[in-house]
Amino acid sequence: EPAVKYRGIFLNDEAPCLTGWVKHTYGTNYGDHRFYARVFELILRLRGNFMWPAMWGWSFYADDPENSKTANDMGVIMGTSHHEPMARNHQEWARKRKEYGAWDYASNQKVIDRFFREGIERAVDTEDLITIGMRGDGDTPMGGKEGEDDKYVSRDKENMRLMEKIFKNQRRIIKEVTGKAPEKRPQVWALYKEVQRFYDMGLRVPDDVIMLLSDDNWGNVRRLPNAEERKHPGGWGIYYHVDYVGAPRNAKWLNVTPIQNMWEQLQLTYDYGVDKLWVLNVGDLKPMEYPITLFLDMAWNPKRYAVDNLLDHPRQFCAQQFGEEQADEAMRILNLYSKYAGRVTAEMLDRKTYNLETGEWKQVSDEFIKLEAEALRQYMTLQQEYKDAYKQLILFPVQAMANLYEMYYAQAMNHKLYKENNPQANYWADKVEQSFKRDKDLCDDYNNVMSGGKWKNMMIQKHIGYTSWNDNFPADKQPEVYRIEEPEKAMGGYVFKSRDGVVAMEAEHYFEKK
C-alpha cells in the first residue's frame, strides 16, 4: 500500500537535450506515444503512477492523439503542470496565440473559457488530474515576467479577486462537461511562487481540491500545512525540484541534489501530512536517474529510511546497477559526489565562488580531483557489462564537475597572478583552456561514444558562460584568461607578501641562520 496516492515526475526544461535525443531516436520533433510508453514503463517500474508531460515546445495531447490513450492503457494518470490549467498544454495556446489573443482572463475570458472547456471535453473519459487556477503566459506571474515577481505585489488583491472568478468558472465548466458535481473529478491547485503568497493572504479553493505546495526550486520546502490546514479534506501535495529554469539561475545540466537533503525534506513533508500528490521536476530525465529513484521510493514508503540507514538506499541502487561486490564503493562515490556537487550548481559556479586566499578554492577542487581518481579506479575494475551504466550514473558526473572546478580554480589563479605580473599566470591560462576543451571532450564521449551513441544529445546542455539567470548565450564560452606576453621581463626573484602583520613567502626562499 503506497503512502502517497499520486506519485510521479514532470519532464521539464526538455530542450535541447531530451528534445534532441527524441529527434535522434524517434525522428520526431515532439514526444510521441512510442517515447511516452517508455517513460510510462519507467514510472511503473519505480512504482509511480502519475506524470506531468513535457511542455516547453511539445504538446502531449495535441502532438499525438495516441499519447493520452497510451497513458490510459498503461495505467498512468496524467496531469498538466502548475501553470497549465484544465487539461490543456501551454503549447496549445502558444501555437494559436494570434487567433486566441491575450492569455489574460480579465480581458479575454470568453476565449479562455472555451479553451478550458475543450480541455475538459477531451479529458472526460480519462483519469487525468485536473489543474485549476491560472498563472501568467508561460510559467510567469500573472501579467508579469520571470524573476520580476516583486514588481507585481501591488496587484495581488486584484489578482486574487480574478482568481476567485477563475475557480468558480472552471468548476462550472467541469460540472457542465462531466454532468457530475465538480468534487467528483479530482483537481489540484499549485501554490507555486507568487500563488503561495495569494494563499497566505487568504485565497482559498473548495474543500475537495488538492493543495500542491512547492519547494524553493532548490530542494528546500517553502511551507508545510499547520495542524488546522492539515484538516483540508482534499489533502496536500508537494512539487519538488532536481532541475530548475528560472531566477536567480538555471540548474539543468547534472544532478546536484545531496541525498541527505532530499531525504530530510521529503521526510519532513510526509510527517506534516503531505501525502496526496508528490511530483518531481526531473528536467531531461536521464541525468536525474538516482534522485528519481529515491523520490519515488520515498513516495511509496517514506518510513523505510532513517538517519542511521539512509545510505542503504544508494547502496541498493548501486548493487542493482553494478553488482553486489562493487556496491559499497560505488555508493560511497555517489554519496560524496552529491555532497560536493550540491554545494554550488555548475551553472552558478565561477572563479569567485570560493575563497582563493584562504585555500578554500584549492581544497574543494582537490576534493573533486581525488573523487574523480577514485571513480576512475573503480570504473577500471568493473566487468564490461557494467561500464556504460557506471559512466552514465557516476563517472561522467564526477569527471564533469571535477573538471569544471579545476577550470574555475585555474581561472581564479590566472587572474590573481596576472595582477601580480607573475609569469605563472600563463600556466594557469593554459589550464583553463585545457579544462574547457576537456569539458567538450567529455560531453562528446557521452553523446557519441558511450553505449554506441545511444544517448546522443543528452549532454548538449549549455553550462559555461552564464551572465544572467537564463542561458541566453549561443554556446558554452571559455572563461576569460589573461596572459603575460613577455614573461621573461615579468617580475622575478623573491616574492614576499605581508598581510595582517604576517609575512608569507615560498618555502624555497626561507633560510634560518644557524
Regions found by a protein language model. Give the residues of each.
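Hydrophobic targeting/anchoring helices
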Residues: 54, 82-84, 88-134, 140-141, ...
